[in-house]
């Protein structure tokens, strides 16, 4: 299954690539990791955008999952082939990045029109949208 996590809330400022997470964004990232762990999701690999807010989200999320995130420049912005990036990395691969790119990737794989909120998670399995979690659901699962 392919899991897509949009980065948590980020601070304003520029340059865009260096915007860090806010305290709320850090909380969202930790909760995402705890929620995936409680759901029994065993992430085999994590690929993240190199932009600071996404890399921080991946690091904090993966602490709970026991996985070391790897930076993937193709997730830094613009269209990408999520399935090609995840190919050969294991059964459950977590991608961490940005919108509208992630919502467009979900649409490309499933035909579903979604809008991932900051800190939100979508999971796609063989062309089907299997999971779509907003931060409120993630928080409830993680607690």
Write out the residue ranges for each language-model feature:
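Short, charged, surface-exposed secondary-structure boundary motifs
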Residues: 79-83, 124-127
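Domain-level recognition of soluble alpha/beta enzyme cores
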Residues: 110-143
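Active-site-proximal alpha-helix that buttresses catalytic centers in soluble enzyme cores
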Residues: 1-79, 87-88, 102, 112-120, ...
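A glycine-rich beta-strand to alpha-helix segment
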Residues: 91-108
């Amino acid at each position: 299954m392919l899991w897509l996590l949009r980065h948590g809330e980020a601070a304003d400022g520029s340059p865009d690539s260096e915007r860090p997470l806010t305290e709320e964004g850090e909380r969202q990232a930790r909760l995402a990791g705890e929620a995936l762990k409680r759901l029994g999701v065993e992430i085999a690999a994590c690929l993240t955008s190199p932009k600071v807010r996404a890399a921080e989200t991946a690091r904090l999320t993966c602490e709970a999952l026991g996985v070391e995130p790897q930076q993937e420049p193709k997730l830094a912005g613009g269209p990408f082939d999520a399935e090609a990036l995840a190919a050969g990395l294991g059964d459950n691969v977590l991608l961490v990045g940005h919108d509208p790119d992630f919502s467009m990737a979900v649409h490309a794989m499933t035909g579903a029109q979604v809008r991932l909120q900051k800190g939100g998670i979508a999971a796609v399995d063989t062309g089907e949208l299997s999971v779509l979690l907003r931060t409120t659901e993630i928080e409830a699962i993680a607690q």
